[in-house]
């Protein structure tokens, strides 16, 4: 028997993400959730789940809710003195603890490009205690207007957003339920 909580329904493309290419080559597929690691041989264009409407309440805060869940996505200005980074021989930036840093410019002056960071993502399921979504540190310059939350209609939800800009851009996908984080997948969709 197939467990739908272990699968994810995606809209994918093998082309360059232009509208013209998407109209000709976009397709639906289902993959194992735990197979999303590193880079994939396709571009993730979207998801085959209902999107939950959202509204920005302030410049740095986004609220998303339906009858079962409330999600608050809040950013703050980066305090650069809170961070120590190192650059490897490939120009990739890592925190001193070895964790990869996302949403930066991979040059020696990358700290000048760190403007915003995720302050918190608070999730509240009806009748449950709220919790903060873990593993959001080192995801810099998130774009609030790109945040999308989807109801997987099996007790799980997904939040997808972009961060950074141009060559420093990234996408983040978090799958979660009322108990907490199930999967985090960070990728570059180019």
Write out the residue ranges for each language-model feature.
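Exposed acidic/polar residues on beta-strands and adjacent loops within beta-sheet cores, strongest
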Residues: 3-190
């Amino acid at each position: 028997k197939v467990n739908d909580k272990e699968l994810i329904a995606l809209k994918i493309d093998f082309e360059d993400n232009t509208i013209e290419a998407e109209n000709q080559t976009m397709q639906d597929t289902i993959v194992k959730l735990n197979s999303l690691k590193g880079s994939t041989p396709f571009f993730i264009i979207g998801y085959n789940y209902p999107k939950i409407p959202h509204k920005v309440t302030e410049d740095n805060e986004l609220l998303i809710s339906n009858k079962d869940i409330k999600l608050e996505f809040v950013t703050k200005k980066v305090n650069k003195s809170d961070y120590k980074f190192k650059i490897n021989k490939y120009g990739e930036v890592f925190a001193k603890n070895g964790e990869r840093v996302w949403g930066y410019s991979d040059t020696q002056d990358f700290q000048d490009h760190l403007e915003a960071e995720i302050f918190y993502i608070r999730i509240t399921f009806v009748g449950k205690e709220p919790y903060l979504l873990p593993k959001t540190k080192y995801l810099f310059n998130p774009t609030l207007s790109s945040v999308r939350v989807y109801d997987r209609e099996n007790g799980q939800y997904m939040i997808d957003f972009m961060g950074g800009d141009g060559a420093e851009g990234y996408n983040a996908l978090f799958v979660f339920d009322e108990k907490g984080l199930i999967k985090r997948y960070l990728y570059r969709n180019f």
